[in-house]
Amino acid sequence: MITERFAGLRADLAFIAHWVTPGSRVLDLGCGDGAMMDYLQAEKGCTGYGVEIDDARIPRCVHRGVSVIQQDLEGGLAMFADDAFDSVLCLS
């Protein structure tokens, strides 16, 4: 059930979020404005990080309360231990 706060969540994101286990640790690659992580944190009790290359999108993520790392994915993800996440998302 999507609350009023997330009524505008893209239908494809809502569909994918359905498959994420409540309370899981999530890494959202290319997280954009943080909408997906915001939803997962608020509605499913998930924790995790978003990774975004675009500097202009970082403030919106922070405003939403998403832990975000500004980085080009070409640099790899060595900062995270193996098995640090239950789910990894990469949506466009």
Regions found by a protein language model. Give the residues of each.
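Conserved N-terminal segment of class I S-adenosyl-L-methionine
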Residues: 1-83, 87
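A short beta-strand submotif of the Rossmann-like class I SAM-dependent methyltransferase core
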Residues: 90-91
